[in-house]
Amino acid sequence: METNDRQKSWLKVWGGRLLNMIFFFCMLFVVYLVSGVFIVTSFKIPSDSMEPSLQTGDCILVDKCSKGARLFDVFAALEKKEVKIHRMPGWRKFNRNDVLVFNFPYPGRWDSIAFDVMSYYVKRCIAVPGDTLEIKDCHYRVKGHDGYLGNTAAQDKLQKLLDSEEFVNRGIVVESYPFDKELGWSIAEFGPLYIPAKGSVVEMDSLNRMLYRNLIEWEQKEKLTFRRDTVLLGDSVISRYCFRENYYFVSGDKMENSKDSRYWGLLPEPFIVGRALRIWKSKDDRSGSIKWGRVWKKIE
């Protein structure tokens, strides 16, 4: 009888401890999920397009909450269905020179924007909603902004490359968005390009039709067509357009090897995951060793 009582007591004690451990790990998992969705998440850098700021093998922490975390139907997005993206309230805007992680807006084809939840890029924000951007001699310029924009050393280097014949050997594509021969924009001479802000209005002249066609079709889920001097959105004639979303111009820091807004156009705000903060781990892909000098480095 005494032995049975001891066994029951032992089972009660250890059963309680086991339940507490299970509860603890369940709560830990819930905290991990909630923080990953609403607060901060991690991404691994797959390429050298953001060197020297970010290197291949860097694992970065991305702030989701300051601008507001995104909410959408993940399962529908994984099935590549159209999803409505909502953003929670935040206390900070995305600013020029922020390093942003986002879903690449052209995962399938270059003439239409689509949301691919599994396709992520990281680039530096050069121009924000309401800005007017130009590229002069490979250097970024924003009207009314006197500070630096992007990696100025890389802009100097690209200018020298384009002044020589070396860019041909490196396979650098000089032509840029919107790839119109008459307009003649390039990665050396580009713009001026107005970066649409939510609520801003543009006239539907021949230039704006070309520059903003993909954005308008994505917002409206209607085709933009032209009949002589008439612009049709679906079956409706329009002479101007009011944007529903904010947009950004982004660029890689390694400008001679980065496919960014110079080539594919503007980034819709709903596609932005958040702002890169720090490198929490960095691993050499060849040797497998940790790059301790880069661990916990602030991303600037």
Task: Describe each model-derived feature in a short phrase.
Residues 19-38:
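Hydrophobic membrane-insertion alpha-helices, especially the h-region
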Residues 41-42, 127:
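Cytochrome P450 fold signature focused on the C-terminal beta-domain
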Residues 42-53:
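N-terminal signal-anchor transmembrane helix
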Residues 2-15, 51-300:
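Soluble "head" domains of membrane/secretory-pathway proteins
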